Amino acid sequence: MVTTHNLGFPRIGAKRELKFGLERYWKGESSRGALKALGAELRQRHWNDQRDLDLAPVGDFAFYDQVLDMSFTLGNLPKRVQGFHGDALDNYFRVARGRSAQSAEEHAACCGGVSAGEMTKWFDTNYHYIVPEFHADTNFSLDPSRLLQQLAEAQAQGVAAKPVIVGPVTYLWLGKAKDDSDRLALLPKLLPVYGALLDTLTAQGVEWVQIDEPILVTELDAAWQQAFRTAYAALETRRIKVLLATYFGQLQGNLALATSLPVDGLHVDAINARDEVDALARELPAERVLSVGAINGRNIWKTDLNATLDWLEPLAKRLGDRLWLAPSCSLLHVPVDLASEEKLDAEIRSWLAFALQKLDELKVLATALNEGRDKVADALAANAAAIHSRRHSPRVNNPAVKAAIARIDAQLGNRVSPYTQRAPKQSARLNLPAFPTTTIGSFPQTGEIRQARSQFKAGTLDEAGYRKAMQAEIERSVREQESLELDVLVHGEAERNDMVEYFGEQLDGYAFSQFGWVQSYGSRCVKPPILFGDISRPKAMTVEWITYAQSLTNKPMKGMLTGPVTILNWSFVRDDQPRSVSCYQLALAIREEVLDLEKAGVRVIQIDEAALREGLPLRRAQWGEYLKWAVESFRITANGVQDDTQIHTHMCYSEFNDIIASIADMDADVITIETSRSDMELLDAFDNFKYPNEIGPGVYDIHSPNIPTQEHIVGLMKKAAERIPAERLWVNPDCGLKTRQWAEVIPALTNMVAAAKTLRNQVQ
């Protein structure tokens, strides 16, 4: 009999209950007890949703991030929070976001907030984790209380529980040594704590534990490969059964290593590594389980169940009870329930599967393998009809778009002149001071903004009323920026619910869900649009709002667009053509918007490519092809303008050292980047690479409510000036200010502008 299980479930709730509960607690509007009760309620609901599985995950729920949870389980707290006392949950939030609830901070042993932990992308997804911090003298100590609490809840509910933990080698790999020490040198101190954790789970009656080691799908050198052998040899003596889980890619050169480790089962991502399944079935020792991730845990399209059974059936015959079935990875990366989508186009809806529907697909596959296809004939027939409908729908294919793609040539991505000739023309047109100040684009999304948007979508506010409300918010943003004496202004993006969804709503080839939310980090959720067909732009998308904002001021007003690579990487993308083709389609559509903004007199146009890096394949050998079409797509979008129009781009959570040449090849006049959480460490990339254009290293962390001081900003910019000529430096926050409050934004930007004025006097 085939065993079914799941690697992880979305934690936010079908209607984002966790998001709202967290934000109430942080604002002091609810108690710690209420937040913990909400967590327990969500866990109970999610285990009930997974009741048909043979094994359900436990420990996949986190109030902020599963890697941060693991840091607390291992007793690895940053030194800066160790002086705080009180409830561990408040310390947890201090590490995650710099502070906990206001009431907790008022009674803390130390005063004020602390620096939030560094946050970065989880492999090549749009989820973010809090980076573990290490020093040469880091010690570990077991605190299993969070995991044991969840395990007790699951067992009381009758759940066949499979605890999920981040593996020891991946945990070290995900972290950063703050003193440049060797992370692997900590492995001998870490392994006894993992051993004690496994013993603790055994004592609670746990039969199987899932240990996630996704770095096995990356390129590992000999030292990291040896770390796996050392780690699992040390853990082998434990009585608990270990399912080693990999996902997001192929094992390739690590396949022999993975099959040789002394564990009881191995999970592989059969969506990305389908070609490796047969080799794994051959090479895995005869007593071990092979868990096959046959359902895509990262995208929302229905699985072709009949085609999947065609290759699973011979595997099941070969492996028998040793075959387990699961999604390819945790379902954290997809929305919860398609049944909530009452307004989604019926035809498109029939092509989709969210988390609960993926579990249904899993059940159909298992039943077909265990009892024969006849037992699920109706489900298989319905699935086949949906697959056929999508494949042959005229809504998916647009001949005019395909013809435009065929006409793309190299000249389409070239500016009229090189940067050295463009820069003087832009300087003359814009007349900016040294260290010009700007923001990244968005200002706080107030309750009034959200209410107006909600009323407009519900039909209780007409278009004229909505436009008036948005114009009032835009004017407020402009007046605040003028009062702050910022140099290049933005309109604030009041009309935009999301930097990707906003554009997707106005492009043909996209569809939109009501409740298709996925977690990005903490309480931050995104609702990726659904790219189902060929992309085109029926009409201008932003020109009306930007030109209105420009009419309110004589200062330069940035046009704000999201770039094609980011729209692609932050969408649920069709899987029936190469991603590069979809990206080129987006590039042509956004290019039309860039040219319309220029015609309307907009002097500065920002094209955000926040997600450029996250699209990189996990293996460096595959980077070249991705970067080629990603950079080409940006250049097609941006480079139709005249020399005196200044093109900005923004990237966040990115490390640049290894792709700096490709970023330079994008040829944006100004690039703004996230650097404050890493203390300008990202600028190390410029030590050995002379970046030719202008750059704005982010000077304060907008993901934390803490207010940066003028002195801190000056210090960061002086560090930047050691690597970048001062005349090519801009002063700006790390990212957009959408998630902050005006009461936080005004003092932060006041200090930022004051710092820029100080720099103009101090730095030559």
From Swiss-Prot:
Enzyme class, UniProt record, top EC level: transferase
Keyword Transferase: yes
UniProt: L-methionine binding residues: I440, G441, S442, E493, D608
Pathway: Amino-acid biosynthesis; L-methionine biosynthesis via de novo pathway; L-methionine from L-homocysteine (MetE route): step 1/1
Cofactor, free-text remark: Binds 1 zinc ion per subunit.
An annotated GO BP: methylation
UniProt: 5-methyltetrahydropteroyltri-L-glutamate binding residues: R16, E17, L18, K19, K121, R524, C525, W570, E614
Gene name tied to this protein: metE
InterPro entries for this protein: Cbl-indep_Met_Synth_N, Cobalamin-indep_Met_synthase, Met_Synth_C/arc, UROD/MetE-like_sf
A Pfam family it matches: Meth_synt_2
GO molecular function term, any single one: zinc ion binding
Binding residues annotated for Zn(2+), in chain numbering: H650, C652, E674, C735
Annotated catalysed reactions: 5-methyltetrahydropteroyltri-L-glutamate + L-homocysteine = tetrahydropteroyltri-L-glutamate + L-methionine
Name under which the protein is recorded: 5-methyltetrahydropteroyltriglutamate--homocysteine methyltransferase
Function as written in the Swiss-Prot or TrEMBL entry: Catalyzes the transfer of a methyl group from 5-methyltetrahydrofolate to homocysteine resulting in methionine formation.
Binding locations of L-homocysteine: I440, G441, S442, E493, D608
Active-site positions on this chain: H703 (proton donor)
Family: Belongs to the vitamin-B12 independent methionine synthase family.
Cofactor(s) this protein requires: Zn(2+)
EC number from the UniProt entry: 2.1.1.14
Record keywords, A-Z: Amino-acid biosynthesis, Metal-binding, Methionine biosynthesis, Methyltransferase, Repeat, Transferase, Zinc
